[in-house]
Design a protein with these regions (language model features):
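Hydrophobic core segments of alpha-helical transmembrane domains in multi-pass membrane transport
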Residues: 23-34, 75-81, 111-113, 194-200, ...
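Structural signature of hydrophobic alpha-helical transmembrane segments
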Residues: 64-76, 124-139, 180-193, 229-237, ...
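C-terminal ends of transmembrane helices
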Residues: 6-10, 78-93, 142-153, 196-207, ...
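Predominantly late transmembrane helices and immediately cytosolic-facing juxtamembrane segments
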Residues: 1-15, 204, 208-218, 222, ...
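Entry/N-cap segments of selected transmembrane alpha helices
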Residues: 87-113, 184-193, 281-307, 330-334, ...
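Hydrophobic transmembrane alpha-helices of secondary-active transporters
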Residues: 56, 60-61, 65-89, 239-241, ...
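Functional cores that coordinate and move charged inorganic groups
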Residues: 145, 149-242
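Transmembrane alpha-helix boundary signature
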Residues: 33-44, 61-64, 78-93, 112-131
Length: 390
């Protein structure tokens, strides 16, 4: 059964795995540059302002904000296409198949958040970062898994992919409900009107992307102005892309997913990693990691993630609610649970939102995310390597 299930998945896995390695290279380059004589150029370039628009209709944002607000909206558009496809015909379309990654993902979001809250309890400012260690970087985690090749059952790769996709859905909901600014009812109304037009296009059977793109571009602008984070526009747009097919033709959703995936994997996410992973390590010591923000993130990712995913998955299997992935052991599953602690790009993104008004914590976020993700990478890899030899 796994062989049949994995056919549409293998292309996606290879793409995400390769993307993870590119992300790693981008992050390393950012760290090297931000700690070299080019550091001033690096940070100043990210803070340069660019105006995009016509006359008074447009936005003037820093390079850093264009990356985090526009490029990440495209990323979330792509992620939502994946989620929609998975719920319609993929690993999440059958409740019995979906329960294990769903339950594991819930544990992987709740426990890290709890760990962070315990460490930062009593500080209202730093508590705002509670969601940072709840995210999983799907590309990076699958990239590490790919290094083990056939030694890891395909069922575990599917489990990790499904769990990370559900994690992304959780991140989308967290951004929408917890990290939005002061809301403008007038712009929210325009967002709603735009969305209604998109739904009408869907219901009318429009299968060309251009009409969706034009309305979606306006909706992104209205969303940014409304106070809701602009990435939510990508989510709303993707939710209206039709997935119905006639004959042997692919749906618009499938066509778009395949068309933009290389750009997301090898351009958008590496650019995001390069722009957000740079942090000065000058004066960094063990005491830096023991500050509440980086420590909460580090332990949330490295301890909270593996404990949450593993315990929730264990209970789900033992109570008969869900089934173990085919041809896998508990040690296999534990290794994958550890890899979910690779938060990297998603954790950095949530961190930027959480401390948008308190930027003094951003360096601590980067240190905690990088340290927690690195520990999860090394420990998870060696656990899986050891389990494959038994």
């Amino acid at each position: 059964m796994i062989n049949n299930l994995s056919k549409p998945f293998k292309w996606f896995f290879k793409l995400e795995a390769a993307s993870g390695l590119v992300l790693l290279i981008s992050a390393i380059i950012a760290l090297i540059i931000s700690n070299s004589y080019l550091s001033e150029l690096y940070f100043n370039t990210l803070e340069q302002y660019l105006f995009i628009g016509i006359n008074d209709f447009g936005l003037k944002l820093s390079v850093h904000h264009w990356i985090n607000d526009l490029l990440m909206a495209i990323f979330f558009f792509f992620v939502t296409l994946e989620i929609k496809r998975e719920f319609i015909q993929g690993e999440l379309s059958n409740l019995k198949k979906a329960l294990l990654p769903i339950i594991g993902a819930v544990g992987g979001m709740l426990v890290p958040a709890l760990v962070y809250i315990v460490i930062n309890f009593g500080d209202i400012e730093t508590l705002n970062g509670w969601a940072i260690p709840s995210a999983t970087d799907i590309a990076f985690s699958l990239g590490i898994l790919s290094l083990l090749g056939s030694r890891v059952p395909i069922s575990l790769k599917i489990f990790l992919t499904a769990l990370a996709i559900i994690d992304d859905l959780g991140a989308i909901l967290i951004i929408a409900f917890f990290y939005s600014g002061d809301l403008s009812l007038s712009y929210l109304s325009l967002v709603l009107i735009s969305y209604i037009f998109l739904v009408i296009l869907n219901k009318s059977g429009v299968k060309k992307f251009i009409p969706y793109l034009i309305i979606g571009a306006f909706m992104w602008f209205f969303t940014y102005k409304s106070g809701i984070h602009a990435t939510i526009a990508g989510v709303l747009l993707a939710s209206t892309i039709p997935h119905k097919v006639k004959g042997k033709d692919f749906s618009l959703l499938i066509k778009l997913e395949h068309a933009i995936s290389p750009y997301v994997a090898f351009m958008i996410m590496p650019i995001f990693a390069f722009a957000n992973a740079g942090v000065s390590l000058e004066g960094l010591s063990l005491l830096s990691l023991l500050q509440p923000v980086p420590l909460g993130i580090l332990l949330g990712l490295f301890v909270g993630k593996q404990v949450g995913v593993m315990i929730f998955s264990f209970v789900a299997v033992k109570t008969g609610m869900a089934q173990m992935p085919d041809n896998s052991s508990w040690l296999n599953l534990y290794g994958v649970s550890v890899l979910t602690g690779i938060g990297f790009t998603m954790s950095l993104f949530v961190g930027n939102l959480a401390f948008a008004e308190n930027i003094q914590y951003i360096d601590g976020v980067k240190i905690g995310v990088l340290a927690g993700s690195l520990l999860s990478t090394l420990f998870g890899y060696f656990i899986l390597l050891f389990s494959s030899k038994k």
